[in-house]
C-alpha cells in the first residue's frame, strides 16, 4: 500500500539465488490481484511510460518475469472509464539494448476512445494509433492485437458511433502511423465514411475489401483496393452491388469497377483526377443503363436515361 495505491492479493517469487544477477529476465512473479487500485504515478517509478494522474482498478492473475509476463483473465478499469477484459502478454517493458517492447492481447472486450487510450500510454499508444480513430468516439473492440514499436497485427471486430468494422490487417512502419504500410481485409457494416473522411457528399457504406497500401489521411492515402461494395451512399443516392479493383493515390483513382445497381449498370476502366474543381476523366466505360435523374446527376427527368460507350 502507498499513499495512492492499494493492493489485496498474493505475491510469490520463484527463483534460484543466481537469478538475482538478471532479475528482470530470470525471477518469476506469480501475483494474484484480488482487488487493486494502482496509481499510474506509482507505476512510473518502475516503467516511465504511463500517463500521469491515472488510476487503474485491476483484477488479474499475473505470471512471468518483469520482461515477459502475462496478465491472465484481466479485468481493468481506469478512472477515465476505459475498460479492458482479456489476456495480455507483455515483453521487454524493462528491456535493454535489442530487447524491444512487445504486446500480444486477446481481448474479450476493450472499451475506450482514441483520447483515453492516449492517456494510458501516451508515447506508445499515442504514436501508434492513427489520428483518424479520434472520429470514432468510444469504441468496443473484440479480438487480437499484436503490437511493437514497428508493427501492428490486428484481427478485430469494432463497434463505434460511426458503425461496425471488422479487420484483419498487418501494419508496418508505424513510427509515422498516419503513413503506415498496411495489408489485409477490411469489412465495414453501415459505416459512416463521410464523417471519417470529412466528405459531406459521402454517407454510410457496407463493403468487403482487400487492401494493400499506405496512409490513413486524404493527403497520404495510396492503396490498392479489391472487393465488393454492397452499399455506398454518394450524392444523395445509395449505390448497391458494385465490384472494384483499382488503386487510390490522392487525388487520383485508377482502376476498374462494375456496377449492377438497378439504376446504374456499367463497366468502367480508367483514371479520375479529383484535384481540380472541374474534374478530369480518362476512361473507357460500357453503360448498359444509367438513370442520371435518380442518381442526382441531372435535374430534368425527361433526359435522364443514358446508355452507350
Language-model region placement:
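Interface amphipathic segments
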Residues: 1-309
